[in-house]
Amino acid sequence: TCSGSITNDSYTLHCFSNAVHGGVDLERSLAKSCNSSFANIGLSLNLRDFSETCEELLFNRDLPIDFAGSGSRFSLSADSGKSEVMATAIGQGKTLVSPLHMALIVCAIQNDGVLMRPYLADRVENSDGGRVEQYEPSVYGRLMTEKEAKILRRYMKTVVEDGTASALKSDSYVAAGKTGSAEY
C-alpha cells in the first residue's frame, strides 16, 4: 500500500508530488509512476536475477547499431545497500540509459518482444532517383517473450488512458507510453 513515500535504512523515497496511491497492482504502479511500489518491488527482488534481466534488455552491452550512440549502464550487486536498490528500482541510482536504448526497448515491446536492428536510411538513391543501395530490415534478437511484450503494451496504454501521460489521451488515436524523470 502506497502512503506517498517509503523509508528504509534512513532513506526516504517520495512519489511525485507526494501522491498517495493506496493499494496498487503492477499495472497501476506503472500508470501512476508509484515510486513507493517500485521501491518495494526492488527490495523484494533477487538482485542477481534483476541484473540478468537488465542485461537481457541490453544494459551493460553494446547496442546493436552501426552508428555512434552511447550504451547504458545498470549496476547493482549483492553489496548494494537498500537505498541504492530502492533508487535503482525507480530508474535512478547508478543506472544510466540513453534515449536510443529506451527507444529500442519500446520498439521490441511493440514488436512482440523481437528487436530489429535499427538503421538510419532505408535506401540510397542517385540524383535520378535510381536506387543505388537498399537496406533490408534484420532481426537482432528476442528481448522478451511475446506474452511479456503484450502485457507491457497493455500497461503502457494504461499510462496514457488513466495515468501520468493522460494528456496524450485522444479519441483520434491510440497511444501508449511511460513517463519518467531524468533525476529524482
At which residue positions do the language-model features occur?
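Beta-lactam-recognizing serine transpeptidase/beta-lactamase-like catalytic domain environment
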Residues: 1-184
